[in-house]
């Protein structure tokens, strides 16, 4: 099986993190059980995202912790183009673990949206880790108060074929609209931000963690407000698309007058379905037993909660992960 390693930067990052985390051990070593041969002699590739994003450094911190906690394990972090590429890498056996958005995995499993006509197999869920929030940004002076007010407005729904576009279309659908009801643009987040600053856009969609630095920076030049996605429409979205969860953005995140109610997908860890139960069990156990250390290494680690480990999961848990969550009463 061909396995692709990118530049040594990823490995160097993990080693550097290992030095910074030395002496910050969690609840003790997790020794691999004797049953079940280790895949690739315990050497694993962890596909993440771009080096300037969240997935890559967070994955590096996870790898360092798990390498130190599980005897015989050597996880190397790989920089990638994020969710869609990661799912393909894991499906082909070119990566063993990956971080992806749960909605994108759902599309892959069903062969729809970004994966139209190419249903993906061989990928299991390990854990749901933190929310990626659907944010609908408008100018504070735009006069747009609700999603229903988007009719006839200039709206960016994200790059064509992106996860953001899929989220935006689903939100419009829940409110009884399609792209025919708005003056639609399919722009990247950077392009949307530039157009928004130049008053060439009314609202735009972004799916990301909060606070989103780019939104904070935009607010300096043009005051922003976020729209609520709530009520019966949010309930419909969660019912129709189980990868969504409801969530509130506290008012102090962006300085909004009140908390914003919206929906979120989840960043999740996936694995090859053919990894044996023991190695995925040990990976999962080591991760959750060392969350305080992970939180010290990366801010997103503080958002990972054991009780949310199965939130928004629509593709089956790997048996090793399911075993651990059963032991600790989750799911």
Stretches found by the model and what they are:
Residues 1-43:
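Short, low-complexity disordered leader/linker segments with a strong preference
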Residues 63-71, 91-95, 110, 155, ...:
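Sec-exported extracytoplasmic/periplasmic mature domains
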């Amino acid at each position: 099986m061909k396995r692709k390693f990118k530049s040594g930067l990823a490995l160097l990052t993990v080693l550097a993190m290992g030095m910074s985390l030395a002496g910050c051990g969690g609840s003790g070593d997790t020794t691999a059980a004797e049953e079940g041969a280790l895949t690739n002699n315990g050497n694993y590739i962890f596909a993440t995202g771009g080096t300037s994003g969240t997935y890559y450094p967070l994955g590096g911190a996870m790898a360092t912790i798990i390498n130190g906690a599980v005897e015989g394990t050597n996880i190397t972090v790989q920089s990638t183009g994020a969710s869609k590429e990661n799912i393909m890498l894991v499906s082909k056996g070119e990566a063993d673990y990956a971080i992806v958005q749960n909605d994108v995995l759902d599309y892959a499993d069903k062969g729809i949206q970004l994966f139209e006509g190419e249903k993906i197999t061989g990928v299991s869920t390990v854990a749901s880790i933190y929310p990626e929030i659907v944010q609908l940004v408008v100018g504070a002076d735009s006069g747009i108060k609700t999603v229903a007010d988007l009719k006839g407005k200039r709206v960016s729904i994200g790059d064509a074929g992106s996860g953001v576009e899929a989220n935006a279309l689903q939100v419009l659908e829940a409110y009884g609209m399609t792209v025919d009801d708005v003056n639609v643009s399919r722009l990247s987040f950077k392009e949307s931000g530039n157009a928004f600053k130049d008053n060439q856009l009314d609202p735009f969609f972004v799916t990301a963690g909060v606070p989103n630095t780019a939104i904070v920076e935009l607010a300096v030049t043009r005051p922003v407000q976020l729209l609520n996605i709530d009520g019966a429409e949010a309930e419909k979205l969660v019912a129709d698309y189980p990868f969504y969860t409801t969530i509130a953005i506290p008012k102090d995140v962006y300085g909004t007058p009140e908390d914003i109610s919206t929906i979120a997908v989840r960043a999740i860890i996936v694995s090859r379905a053919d990894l044996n139960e023991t190695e995925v069990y040990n990976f999962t156990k080591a991760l959750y037993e060392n969350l305080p250390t992970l939180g010290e290494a990366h801010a997103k680690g503080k958002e990972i909660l054991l009780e949310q480990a199965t939130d928004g999961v629509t593709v089956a848990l790997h048996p090793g992960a399911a075993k651990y969550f059963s032991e600790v009463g989750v799911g």
